[in-house]
Regions:
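Compact beta-sheet-dominated domain cores in extracellular/mature segments
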Residues: 23-132
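Bacterial N-terminal signal peptides
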Residues: 10-24
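Short helix-onset patch at the extreme N-terminus, typifying the N->h transition
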Residues: 6-9, 76
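Positively charged n-region of N-terminal signal peptides that target proteins for export
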Residues: 1-5
Length: 132
């Protein structure tokens, strides 16, 4: 739940190092899990927030940076995180490690307010639920 609040603050009042540090502090150690959302079963983070994939990402490469990454928060992996099964990591342009599912980087949507929300599905016809 803290991630959307931090993202909203960063979008409204600035960006830069403070926001980067705040978002990095919310890194996830374990792989995402599946859960029911408002639009069906999807992968979720540790807080139960719906995860999404971006059509414009390449295999093993995020193309959502700068302002895009304020609205679509990369699911950052903790330095101790271990990949397993279909879950892996990509290295973002800023050097941080991001969780990926079947090679596709994973994100949360800043406008989802509570676990189970799935308001990002279909945004600009390029954002979709990350389905297990």
């Amino acid at each position: 739940m803290r991630i959307p609040i931090v993202a909203a603050f960063c979008a409204a009042f600035g960006s830069g190092l403070v926001c980067l540090l705040a978002l990095t502090a919310l890194a996830q150690t374990v792989a995402p899990t599946g859960a029911e959302t408002a639009k069906g079963k999807a992968l979720v983070d540790l807080n139960g927030m719906t995860l999404y994939v971006f059509d414009r990402d390449g295999a093993g490469k995020s193309n959502c940076n700068a302002q895009c990454a304020v609205a679509w928060l990369p699911l950052i992996a903790d330095t101790d995180a271990q990949a397993s099964g279909s879950f892996s990591f990509i290295t973002r342009d800023d050097g941080r490690k991001q969780w990926a599912y079947k090679g596709k980087p994973l994100y949360t949507w800043a406008k989802d307010k509570k676990p189970g929300d799935a308001t990002g599905d279909g945004v600009n016809k390029v954002w979709h639920l990350a389905s297990p």
